[in-house]
Regions:
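Helix-loop-helix hairpin linking two adjacent transmembrane segments in secondary transporters
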Residues: 143-193
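Extracytoplasmic gate region of multi-pass secondary transporters
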Residues: 30-31, 226-280, 342, 346
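Cytoplasmic helix-loop-helix junction between adjacent transmembrane helices
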Residues: 105-144
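Structural signature of the two symmetry-related core transmembrane helices
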Residues: 77-91, 298-315, 396
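Extracytoplasmic
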Residues: 11-45, 246-251
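C-terminal transmembrane helical hairpin of 12-TM major facilitator-type secondary transporters
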Residues: 297-344
Length: 425
């Protein structure tokens, strides 16, 4: 009788979903206690926006190094260290009162979260088949944007029961517990895991998209000769610029434009809830399209382009209504579109990078987080001088640029064809 294949790899996809939930709850909670923090610490809007910018600076600077470290030391060690590190600095955020120190803490918090996505890319390259990578990547992404769905509910409950500082203490403790669990259950390769039977191991090893299990140094000179290496970074700059703007400023927008109070702020979770569902759906659809024999450009690029177009159209309608619920509907649809594009970005990064997926995804996420670094501060300045409507409408311009870039990403042409040689230009 043919041995039935185990599905241990999907257990790890679920684990990454929960890691994503924790990471983005830790990131998003600060936006729901913005007023309390600004009042207690005497911060202006631009100063508060700098907290997110310092996080993004630390996060961005460590993207490429963390991807290379994940390739060298394995995602098991990197994820464990990352969870403990960022959870410790989450806890410290609630303890610091000095402006300069809290900026430093948020910078180091960003350093700690940096290895999460590149390590996931390395893990997926070795644990999943070519056709499964889009769906596997969507698990962490879906968790990341289910985090903001839970964040307002949990944050508001903690603040009502204790104070805003307790939010950081409790969230940080959960992250440390997750680090312990991950260290116990995870292995870098399916060949190393005793729960993976021979049928699953054989399926993975025959169908994964890597050129060799042995690691070698990334051929940076060859990478820099390919415009697809720049294109995937530019479009992801746009993705994270837009997402971070809404992650930080959406609650404040709803308060100032629609007079939503703190107790009603859970409505701001709806855009992230739709993003969660669309990320999962896009990953599944992308895998199905590949299974039908279509190109990776169709399975990744066309879906990503559709996501940006949905965002651009939705944002126009979102700012031209005086009705809170209509605005939330269009904002939800728009952010859902960006979520689709984000999911395809990570799938395409593993397509391009293959066994250097940690490096390529780290490069992509570096530029994404440069966008995230400047977005909160720039948005704070634009809102003060131009207002919310014009600030949101201006986001259509980078969305159009991102659409153009996707025609140059070319996920069907990987950067690596052997262990030490990049493909010709």
């Amino acid at each position: 009788m043919k041995e039935k294949r185990t599905n241990v790899r999907w257990m790890f996809a679920l684990a990454f979903f929960f890691i994503g939930v924790i990471a983005y709850m830790d990131r998003a909670n600060i936006s729901y206690i913005a007023k309390q923090m600004m009042d207690d610490l005497g911060m202006t809007k631009p100063q508060f926006g700098l907290l997110a910018s310092f996080f993004s600076l630390g996060y961005a600077l460590m993207q490429v190094p963390s991807g290379m470290l994940a390739e060298k030391f394995g995602p098991r060690k990197m994820i464990t260290i990352a969870l403990v590190w960022w959870s410790a600095f989450t806890i410290l955020t609630g303890m610091i009162k000095n402006h300069g120190l809290i900026y430093l803490v948020r910078f180091l918090f960003g350093v700690g979260e940096a290895p999460m996505y590149p390590s996931n890319a390395v893990f997926n390259s070795f644990w999943f088949s070519k056709n499964e990578k889009g769906r596997a990547s969507s698990a962490l992404l879906a968790g990341s944007y289910f985090g903001p769905v839970l964040a307002p509910i949990v944050t508001i409950a903690i603040v009502n029961a204790f104070n805003w500082q307790a939010v950081f203490y409790i969230f940080g403790a959960v992250g440390i517990l997750m680090a312990v669990l991950w260290a116990i259950i995870a292995k870098d390769l399916p060949e190393q895991h005793r729960m993976v039977n021979e049928a699953e191991k054989r399926f993975i090893m025959e169908n994964r998209d890597i050129v060799a299990t042995e690691k070698s140094s990334p051929p940076w000179n060859d990478f820099f000769k390919r415009f697809s290496f720049y294109a995937i970074a530019i479009q992801y700059f746009v993705v994270q610029f837009i997402i971070t703007l809404f992650l930080i400023w959406l609650p404040t927008y709803l308060t100032e434009v629609f007079h939503v109070n703190f107790k009603e702020m859970s409505i701001s979770s709806l855009p992230w809830l739709l993003m969660f569902f669309l990320i999962l759906s896009a990953g599944a659809i992308s895998g199905r399209v590949l299974g039908l024999g279509r190109s990776k450009f169709v399975a990744r690029g066309v879906i990503a382009i559709a996501g940006f177009i949905v965002f651009a159209v939705s944002i126009i309608f979102a700012v031209r209504t005086g009705n809170l619920y209509v605005s939330i509907f269009w904002l939800s649809l728009g952010l859902g579109g960006i979520g689709i594009s984000m999911g395809m970005s990570w799938a395409a990064a593993t397509d391009l990078g293959r066994n250097f997926s940690g490096t390529v995804s780290g490069w992509m996420n570096l530029w994404g987080n440069i966008g995230a670094l400047i977005s909160p501060l720039l948005a704070g300045l634009f809102v003060e001088h131009l207002g919310w409507t014009m600030t949101f409408q201006l986001l259509i311009v980078p969305a159009v640029i991102a659409v153009i870039m996707w025609f140059y990403v070319k996920p069907d042409q990987p950067l690596i064809v052997s262990d030490d040689k990049a493909i010709e230009k």
